[in-house]
C-alpha cells in the first residue's frame, strides 16, 4: 500500500469538496441577494429611484437586524437592491432555481 498516495488523494478530495461546497454557498448567496433585491424594488413600486422606498428599506433593515442578524443593515439591503438592478436583464436570474 502506498500510504503517501492515499494521504495525498484524501487531501485532494477534501480540497475539491471544499471548493464545490464554497461554490454552492456562493451561488446560494448570490441567488438570495438577487431575489431580495428584486423584492425590495417591487416593494418600492418597481422604481429604480424611489425616494419613499428608502424608508421601506430602512424599516425592513431595522426589523431584520432585530429578528435575524445584524448583517441585514440598510447598507447591505441597498447593495442587494443594486445587485438586482445591475443584473436584472442578464441571464443571472436563471440561477434562481
Regions found by a protein language model. Give the residues of each.
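Basic, low-complexity intrinsically disordered segments
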Residues: 1-97
Amino acid at each position: 500500500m502506498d500510504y503517501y498516495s492515499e494521504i495525498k488523494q484524501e487531501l485532494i478530495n477534501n480540497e475539491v469538496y471544499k471548493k464545490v461546497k464554497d461554490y454552492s454557498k456562493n451561488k446560494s448567496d448570490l441567488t438570495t441577494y438577487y431575489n431580495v433585491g428584486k423584492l425590495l424594488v417591487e416593494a418600492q413600486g418597481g422604481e429604480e429611484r424611489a425616494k419613499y422606498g428608502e424608508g421601506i428599506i430602512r424599516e425592513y433593515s431595522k426589523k431584520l437586524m432585530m429578528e435575524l442578524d445584524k448583517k441585514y443593515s440598510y447598507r447591505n439591503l441597498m447593495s442587494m437592491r443594486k445587485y438586482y438592478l445591475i443584473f436584472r436583464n442578464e441571464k443571472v436570474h436563471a440561477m434562481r432555481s
